[in-house]
């Protein structure tokens, strides 16, 4: 019997979308990452980076873990820290949902806020949050996760890639997923391509801030993706194409998933499915596309995604 709650990370369900996929399109399977302990895929990354830092001696038992976060990573780090006996200090912002703030606080986190420009997610905001986290980490007994530059983060998603491969019995034609730090899409791809290099990989970013596509930075409201700049560990050779999705389309799809499929998800998950539908239409009937339900809609009840 596993005694620690972090043993609940991973082995999440993979299901076939039943209603929103057109008849002549490929099948779309979604991996329900909200089945992880905190309700998001980021639990995988948080466990990986903290365990590696502790094993290497960078993180000591009495230390405080520090990170900038749009909330999902922060919740997962706060959770793993609570389970493993560390403290956690987040650089956060009012641009992100209140549910994420309250969940971090529930796990005992300390939060330093960086005020946004009318709750817009911009490159300026993200860079200010990163600078805040760096400054906090300069205190004695503090270790900065520094997810943007932390190569252990992508390794946390190797289990995700292996689970997808096994659950699909190797019958997978495309994987579609949003890019932020790029760790989740790259870590998953590394394993999928280890099994089959012919799997088509499509990265997704906000249309309003499509910097990976070579367009100007801008503001958007798809929480958790679209940094507004190219992340340091972005590897374009690990994707076959980049698709863009508008904030409105992502929000509308999140609502459709709830009403039509019974899947309660956040906006980035909506963006994933919008993009997956495009790939599925192109591939055609008989092919298989996998994407992720990144986190639960419960984290967005205070936002306009679920205000009716």
Roles of regions detected by a PLM:
Residues 1-308:
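PLP-dependent amino-acid enzyme catalytic core
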């Amino acid at each position: 019997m596993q005694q620690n709650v972090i043993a609940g990370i991973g082995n999440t369900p993979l299901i076939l979308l039943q209603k929103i996929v057109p008849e002549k399109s490929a099948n779309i399977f979604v991996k329900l990452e909200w089945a992880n302990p905190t309700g998001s895929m980021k639990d995988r990354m948080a466990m990986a980076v903290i365990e590696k830092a502790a094993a290497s001696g960078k993180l000591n038992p009495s230390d405080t873990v520090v990170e900038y976060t749009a909330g999902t990573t922060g919740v997962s780090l706060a959770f793993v820290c609570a389970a493993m006996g560390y403290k956690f200090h987040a650089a956060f912002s009012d641009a992100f949902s209140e549910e994420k703030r309250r969940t971090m606080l529930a796990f005992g986190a300390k939060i330093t806020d960086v005020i946004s420009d009318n709750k817009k997610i911009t490159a300026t905001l993200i860079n200010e949050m990163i600078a805040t986290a760096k400054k906090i980490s300069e205190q004695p007994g503090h270790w900065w996760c520094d997810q943007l530059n932390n190569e252990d983060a992508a390794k946390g998603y190797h289990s995700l890639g292996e689970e997808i491969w096994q659950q699909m019995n190797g019958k997978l034609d495309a994987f579609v997923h949003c890019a932020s730090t790029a760790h989740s899409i790259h870590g998953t791809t590394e394993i999928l391509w280890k099994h089959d290099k012919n799997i088509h990989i499509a990265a997704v970013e906000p249309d309003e801030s499509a910097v990976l596509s070579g367009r100007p930075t801008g503001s958007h409201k798809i929480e958790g993706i679209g940094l507004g700049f190219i992340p340091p560990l972005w590897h374009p050779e690990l994707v076959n194409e980049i698709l863009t999705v508008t904030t409105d389309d992502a929000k509308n799809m999140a609502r459709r998933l709830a009403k039509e499929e019974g899947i309660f998800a956040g906006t980035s998950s909506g963006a994933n499915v919008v993009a997956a539908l495009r790939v599925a239409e192109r591939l055609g009937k008989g092919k298989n596309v996998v994407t992720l339900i990144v986190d639960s809609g419960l984290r967005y009840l205070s936002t306009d995604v679920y205000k009716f």
